[in-house]
Amino acid sequence: MEKWWFNSMLYKGKLEYRCGLSKSIDRFGNPIEKTSVSEDPVRNDTDKKIHSWSESSSYSNATHFVGVRDVRNFISDDTFLVRDSNRNIYSIYFDITNQIFEIDNDPSLLSERESSFFSYRTYAYLKNGSKNDDPPCDRSMYDTKYSWNNHITSCINSYLGSQICIESSILSSSDNSSDSYISSYIYGESRNSNERGSSSIRTSRNGIDFTRRENSTDFDLTQKYRHLWVQCENCYGLNYKKLLKSKMNICDQCGYHLKMSSSDRIELSIDPGTWDPMDEDMVSLDPIEFHSEEEPYKDRIDSYQRKTGLTDAVQTGTGRLNGIPIAIGVMDFQFMGGSMGSVVGEKITRLIEYATNQFLPLILVCASGGARMQEGSLSLMQMAKISAALYDYQSHKKLFYVSILTSPTTGGVTASFGMLGDIIIAEPNAYIAFAGKRVIEQTLNKIVPEGSQAAEYLFHKGLFDPIVPRNPLKGVLSELFKLHAFFPLN
């Protein structure tokens, strides 16, 4: 039988793995070799594999140590398949991020339950580290789904307690109530998902069979917990939503810059208490009475206004950046894809004119899918109107305009004010283009190479100036303004 062997113990509230596989069990569950115990938390031999156990009780001498840092990889959205000599399969599904644990309850899988599934050593035996003859393996502890669930529950509970911020009401309760909370949460979900069916993709890694299970309820779970977690669109890792804002919406796992709302960007860039918004009451009136077979344009505008709390896809106003007075406009991709309609164009134009009259430096943060098709030529006209206002600001008044391109910046915004900055800054891995990949391929009947519209590729083509991550962005802008003779008032 192919097996993942591990023993665990709770020590000072954290989960530690100490004992690996160096033991074989015959078909009647009798130990035939000693299990070594090591205090070394480092994995000694990562290249060794656990081989199939034949009828003659052959064994492998592979030791796998799993430290706290490796727990995430060991129990993170994977299904471990255990196959016995009769080709029966017993699967264990982990999803630590959504707190899901499933064991297939197929009678054919449980028929070989009498053979030992896992070797277990109690905490006292691990603590003593006895080198004498091993005591008989207590197979009754893990020959039922219930006892195995209890063991995994304690592992998951300990891991959550040491690695994830659990609500204080859970942590402050007793061990029993905490176990009960986790148990009911995990197994309640697993029972429901088992009833609704699933599909799986079978893979093999290092000689051991794995199955990545895709439940039909995955989408429902994502929707259910999206108020708690934000999924990275690059590595698909989950980031805790409460902590994401303090980390500037940067993925913990891969450092990818996730989308930010316009309000969060303003809070990031502008000194506290200095933000003064402009034209907040300006709304679109469906100027061309756009006909839609689905949702009417006015209803769609109202829906996005309720969803985002904004009147349209841009916020404009004045404030101070490290004490320097500035005018700033920030587009919001959450409002109809940041599309540029008549209201967006008018608000940006008024902001530029105000900055021109007040001799203020200007920042425009771009995040847009382009012109808004529901407003037709009026939307396209905003490109020329904004560009004309910028020409007066830059060429006649000799003032300083910084354009910041975030992901995505496409269409009419790229073709107008997005590329007119005196300094054009891009965020890492930002998607920047005029036409999207699919549109180009369908129009020209040519394949667009992957990554050819990413900021790092376009930087080497000279499309913009620096690529600046969010962390130092405010300091970089402050230095640029000082270089162009804009200084703090205090």
UniProtKB/Swiss-Prot annotation:
Transmembrane segments: none
Protein name stated in the entry: Acetyl-coenzyme A carboxylase carboxyl transferase subunit beta, chloroplastic
Keyword field: ATP-binding, Chloroplast, Fatty acid biosynthesis, Fatty acid metabolism, Lipid biosynthesis, Lipid metabolism, Metal-binding, Nucleotide-binding, Plastid, Transferase, Zinc, Zinc-finger
Domain of life assignment: Eukaryota
Gene Ontology BP, a term: malonyl-CoA biosynthetic process
Family under the similarity heading: Belongs to the AccD/PCCB family.
Zinc finger annotations (C4-type) as residue ranges: 232-254
Species annotation: Eucalyptus globulus subsp. globulus
